[in-house]
UniProtKB/Swiss-Prot annotation:
It is found in: Cytoplasm. It is an enzyme of class 2 (transferase). This is Ribosomal RNA large subunit methyltransferase E. It comes from Halorhodospira halophila (strain DSM 244 / SL1). The active site is at 167 (proton acceptor). The gene is rlmE. Residues 1-24 are annotated as: Disordered.
Amino acid sequence: MATCRRRRRGCNSQARRSRHESDPFVRRARAEGWRSRAALKLEAIDQRDGLFRPGQVVVDLGAAPGGWSQLVAPKVGSAGRVVAIDLLEMDPLPGVTFLHADFSTDEGLRAVERALEGRPVDIVLSDMAPNLTGHNAVDQPAAMGLAELAADFAGQFLHKNGDFLVKVFHGEGFDAFRGDLTRRFSRVLSRKPDASRSGSREVYLLARGPTV
């Protein structure tokens, strides 16, 4: 019989699944009906920083499976608007306009503009992460590339009092990215909610009030 030593990759995968299933935030998210544990991270940031109000317009980049949009839609209410966009399919959510598109393309941007119907954007959200290979030399640049795409989108669509919340990872490129946000926004805050795994390099940057 093959042992874990002989099949390290498979055993590592099993260990990750086991940690995921035993995670109290995963269990809580399921019990509360959220599509992903990421909703609990956003809820914690909202409770601390007061992001969402009725009537706001929010764009959720890389939205699938929809945990963030699911949380935000009732907060902004019927007077608000949530536009979710992803290359992956996403099951419909009440109060959410889903675009199956790539926001980094001209076609995707035009789709967002049509969905907004001329309304200014109050908040841009990005919980995107690349498909991880396990090799930091590959994964970190890919993650920072997604964050930079999201920042460019926010710079194009946010109004002057808007907020940009983006997931990034400590490592190469992080300091430069944060420095760029500091030049482009009035304030940049770091947030690591309890629902983020303690050993993860994941952190959320909340950039408030575009200045350029």
